[in-house]
Amino acid sequence: MKTLIITGASAGIGLATARRFADAGYAVTNISRRPCPLPSVNHLPGDLSNAGFLDTLGDRLSEALAGADAVSLIHNASRLLNDSAADTSSDQLRAVMEVNLAAPNTLNRFVIPRMPSGSSILYVGSTLAEKAVPNSFSYVVTKHALVGMMRATCQDLAGRGIHTACICPGFTDTEMLRAHVPEEAMDAVRGLSAYGRLIEPSEIADTLHWAAENPVINGAVLHANLGQVER
């Protein structure tokens, strides 16, 4: 059986992705503080902001990986703050890096040795992985670094039959977006898409599933943003 290990599948893109992979016959395990509401998903409670989050999960995660024909590891969970280069403390930056960068590295070190050929490691980036906007300093910094992590992963795993990619969603209708963008600004955000709408989480889930099944995109950054209008 194919196995999906995903972080942050309690809502938004993560939840839609867990559903998409489960529908495709994957055994799905989620790691997050809040449980994934899908009854078929194996939930491992973990706080990715805690550097030792795997200390209590290792045995159960090993069980989830045991006997898998192929493993897809999706680094979906992330933290987004309203902050800027002028006022973000190093402690605040480290806290965001713990979730957005260190946790993926921790999981990679654990999961990669247990991955058979035919597996994949997918990073959920953002349009802000290759550009910047004001007041999203730590998010922009860490998402840029996530692209570097993906590219380094690709090079380091060459010849092992494990492919990787970074999928960069545009403005997606998630709890995170609505918490970050005031309601009165949502029409303007929709206008930044060539289609004049927000992306549905299921559209990103479909993209992630396709990426997991197609190693030809190994090392690629895939923009999933409906054609973002530059202004």
Label each residue range with its predicted role.
Residues 108, 142-143, 150:
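Active-site helix of classical SDR
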Residues 88, 132-140, 152:
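Active-site loop-to-helix junction immediately N-terminal to the catalytic Tyr of the SDR YXXXK motif
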